[in-house]
Swiss-Prot record:
This is Large ribosomal subunit protein bL9. GO terms for biological process: translation. Binds to the 23S rRNA and protein L31. The lineage of its organism: Bacteria, Thermotogati, Deinococcota, Deinococci, Deinococcales. SUPFAM superfamilies: L9 N-domain-like (SSF55658), Ribosomal protein L9 C-domain (SSF55653). PROSITE patterns: RIBOSOMAL_L9.
Amino acid sequence: MQVILLEPSRLGKTGEVVSVKDGYARNWLIPQGLAVSATRTNMKTLEAQLRSIEKRQAQEKAVAEDLASRLNGVAVELSVRAGEGKIYGAVTHQDVANSLDQLGFDVDRRKIDMPKTVKEVGEYDIAYRAHPEVTIPMKLVVHAAK
Protein backbone atom coordinates (compact mmCIF):
# COMPACT_ATOMS: atom_id res chain seq x y z
CA MET A 1 0.00 0.00 0.00
CA GLN A 2 1.26 3.46 -0.89
CA VAL A 3 1.12 6.08 1.90
CA ILE A 4 2.18 9.71 2.28
CA LEU A 5 4.20 10.31 5.43
CA LEU A 6 2.96 13.17 7.61
CA GLU A 7 5.85 13.01 10.08
CA PRO A 8 9.48 12.05 9.61
CA SER A 9 10.20 8.47 10.63
CA ARG A 10 12.51 5.59 9.83
CA LEU A 11 10.49 5.12 6.63
CA GLY A 12 11.39 8.53 5.20
CA LYS A 13 10.89 12.26 5.38
CA THR A 14 7.65 14.19 5.71
CA GLY A 15 5.74 14.30 2.42
CA GLU A 16 7.43 11.26 0.88
CA VAL A 17 5.33 8.56 -0.74
CA VAL A 18 6.45 5.16 0.53
CA SER A 19 5.26 1.61 0.06
CA VAL A 20 4.39 -0.33 3.23
CA LYS A 21 2.45 -3.48 4.03
CA ASP A 22 -1.32 -3.02 4.14
CA GLY A 23 -1.69 -4.04 7.78
CA TYR A 24 1.07 -1.70 8.95
CA ALA A 25 -0.57 1.21 7.14
CA ARG A 26 -4.15 0.47 8.24
CA ASN A 27 -3.40 -0.60 11.82
CA TRP A 28 -0.59 1.74 12.81
CA LEU A 29 0.44 4.56 10.46
CA ILE A 30 -2.99 5.92 9.50
CA PRO A 31 -4.69 5.60 12.95
CA GLN A 32 -1.69 7.23 14.66
CA GLY A 33 -1.78 10.14 12.20
CA LEU A 34 1.68 9.34 10.88
CA ALA A 35 0.53 8.84 7.28
CA VAL A 36 -2.43 9.04 4.90
CA SER A 37 -3.17 6.77 1.97
CA ALA A 38 -1.72 7.96 -1.32
CA THR A 39 -4.91 8.75 -3.24
CA ARG A 40 -5.09 11.32 -6.04
CA THR A 41 -6.82 13.89 -3.82
CA ASN A 42 -4.28 13.41 -1.04
CA MET A 43 -1.45 13.74 -3.58
CA LYS A 44 -2.89 17.04 -4.88
CA THR A 45 -3.31 18.30 -1.32
CA LEU A 46 0.28 17.29 -0.56
CA GLU A 47 1.58 19.15 -3.61
CA ALA A 48 -0.30 22.30 -2.59
CA GLN A 49 1.06 22.04 0.95
CA LEU A 50 4.60 21.54 -0.32
CA ARG A 51 4.30 24.64 -2.52
CA SER A 52 3.08 26.72 0.43
CA ILE A 53 5.88 25.35 2.62
CA GLU A 54 8.45 26.27 -0.04
CA LYS A 55 7.02 29.81 -0.25
CA ARG A 56 7.12 30.18 3.54
CA GLN A 57 10.71 28.89 3.69
CA ALA A 58 11.74 31.33 0.94
CA GLN A 59 10.16 34.20 2.89
CA GLU A 60 11.89 33.09 6.11
CA LYS A 61 15.22 32.93 4.29
CA ALA A 62 14.69 36.43 2.85
CA VAL A 63 13.96 37.77 6.34
CA ALA A 64 17.07 36.01 7.67
CA GLU A 65 19.22 37.47 4.88
CA ASP A 66 17.84 40.94 5.64
CA LEU A 67 18.74 40.47 9.30
CA ALA A 68 22.19 39.27 8.25
CA SER A 69 22.78 42.43 6.23
CA ARG A 70 21.72 44.60 9.20
CA LEU A 71 23.78 42.59 11.74
CA ASN A 72 26.88 42.53 9.53
CA GLY A 73 29.77 44.07 11.46
CA VAL A 74 27.84 44.51 14.71
CA ALA A 75 29.94 43.89 17.81
CA VAL A 76 28.11 42.95 20.98
CA GLU A 77 29.72 44.68 23.96
CA LEU A 78 28.96 43.56 27.49
CA SER A 79 30.16 45.20 30.67
CA VAL A 80 30.19 42.72 33.54
CA ARG A 81 31.52 42.56 37.07
CA ALA A 82 34.95 41.01 37.07
CA GLY A 83 38.04 40.72 39.19
CA GLU A 84 41.54 40.22 37.76
CA GLY A 85 40.20 39.28 34.32
CA LYS A 86 37.78 36.65 35.65
CA ILE A 87 34.05 37.26 35.45
CA TYR A 88 31.82 36.72 38.47
CA GLY A 89 29.49 34.15 36.94
CA ALA A 90 29.39 33.76 33.15
CA VAL A 91 28.08 35.50 30.06
CA THR A 92 25.05 33.56 28.81
CA HIS A 93 23.12 33.39 25.57
CA GLN A 94 20.40 35.45 27.26
CA ASP A 95 22.90 38.24 28.05
CA VAL A 96 23.88 38.42 24.38
CA ALA A 97 20.22 38.38 23.27
CA ASN A 98 19.39 41.20 25.71
CA SER A 99 22.31 43.26 24.41
CA LEU A 100 21.18 42.76 20.80
CA ASP A 101 17.62 43.65 21.84
CA GLN A 102 18.91 46.95 23.24
CA LEU A 103 20.55 47.59 19.86
CA GLY A 104 17.17 47.08 18.17
CA PHE A 105 17.52 43.48 16.95
CA ASP A 106 14.87 40.98 18.01
CA VAL A 107 16.71 37.65 18.20
CA ASP A 108 16.01 34.23 19.69
CA ARG A 109 18.57 33.35 22.36
CA ARG A 110 18.41 29.66 21.39
CA LYS A 111 19.85 30.45 17.96
CA ILE A 112 23.00 32.10 19.33
CA ASP A 113 26.11 29.91 19.02
CA MET A 114 28.79 30.56 21.60
CA PRO A 115 31.73 28.17 21.15
CA LYS A 116 32.58 27.97 24.83
CA THR A 117 31.48 29.29 28.19
CA VAL A 118 32.53 32.92 28.52
CA LYS A 119 34.06 33.35 31.98
CA GLU A 120 36.88 35.76 31.21
CA VAL A 121 37.18 39.30 29.94
CA GLY A 122 38.09 39.41 26.25
CA GLU A 123 36.91 39.14 22.67
CA TYR A 124 35.05 36.09 21.36
CA ASP A 125 33.67 34.92 18.01
CA ILE A 126 29.97 34.06 18.17
CA ALA A 127 27.33 33.39 15.52
CA TYR A 128 23.59 33.74 15.12
CA ARG A 129 21.76 31.01 13.17
CA ALA A 130 18.92 33.06 11.69
CA HIS A 131 17.97 30.27 9.25
CA PRO A 132 19.41 26.81 8.52
CA GLU A 133 21.14 28.31 5.47
CA VAL A 134 22.03 31.73 6.99
CA THR A 135 24.58 32.02 9.80
CA ILE A 136 25.66 35.49 10.91
CA PRO A 137 29.15 35.78 12.47
CA MET A 138 29.57 38.43 15.18
CA LYS A 139 32.07 39.56 17.78
CA LEU A 140 31.38 39.48 21.50
CA VAL A 141 33.48 41.92 23.51
CA VAL A 142 33.38 41.41 27.26
CA HIS A 143 35.00 44.01 29.51
CA ALA A 144 35.02 44.64 33.24
CA ALA A 145 32.53 47.11 34.68
CA LYS A 146 34.06 50.08 36.46
